[in-house]
Amino acid sequence: MATKLERATRMPRDQRRAQLLDAANEVFTTKGYHAAAMDDIADAAGISKPVLYQHFGSKLDLYLALLDISCDRLVEVVEEAVDSTDVNADRVVAAMGAFYDFVSSASGEFRFVFESDLTGDNSVQKRLWRVNNDIADIIAAVIAEDTALPAEQSKLLAISLVGLAQVSARYWVSADSAHIPLADAQQLVATLAWRGISGFPLTDHPHAEPRPG
């Protein structure tokens, strides 16, 4: 049987890094940051701890790498959802749905963004603010275009929608609401969001705005 060190020498660096991130994701989502140890991650990856430190200088570096991946993925899926249609009501449904799809993913990566146990760390705070701000910018651009509201007001509305999506998705994924089917939860929250945002007068814009549901 190959030793941990022998197995570690057989994998290209990029592939090894991806493997370590997968192992760390499993350990962090199971134990949380504070209870997880680099030994746990090395064991989960089937390597020695010195090999792990060749790729990541500390447990925090490893955690931040995973947080960056999760934040980037959430921004990406929301942006794709917003860009998937020109119909405003459908945009709301798609954007809200993106948050629910994110929290229902088997990878558990949403916990890095929504349930981090390192929110007191400045480097984590900056990343969490960035992901909310980036998503709000995407949504605010659509609101400003369609309603002619000033940029500051559009951004405030967008941040509010992000908060609605995030908190409701976190609640839905908890055991308290596990009985609500995913599609039903998405539609409920999208309808609430649309009934609010559709109350603002539209500019002379070609987009239709049928009420979802």
Features from the language model and the residues they span:
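Short secondary-structure transition hinges
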Residues: A94, D101-A140, A148, L156, ...
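Amphipathic alpha-helical packing segments from all-alpha helical-bundle domains
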Residues: D72-V75, N122-T147, K155-S160, V167, ...
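Hydrophobic alpha-helical connector segments
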Residues: A65, E79-G108, L149, L157-L161, ...
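N-terminal intrinsically disordered/low-complexity leader segments
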Residues: M1-Q15, P201-G213
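Short, structured helix-loop boundary elements
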Residues: R17-A18, M38, L60, L64, ...
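Amphipathic C-terminal alpha-helical segment
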Residues: F102-S105, E109, A141, A158-H179, ...
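Hydrophobic/aromatic residues within well-ordered alpha-helical segments
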Residues: R16, K59, L66, S70, ...
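Helix-turn-helix
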Residues: Q19, A23, V27-D61, A65
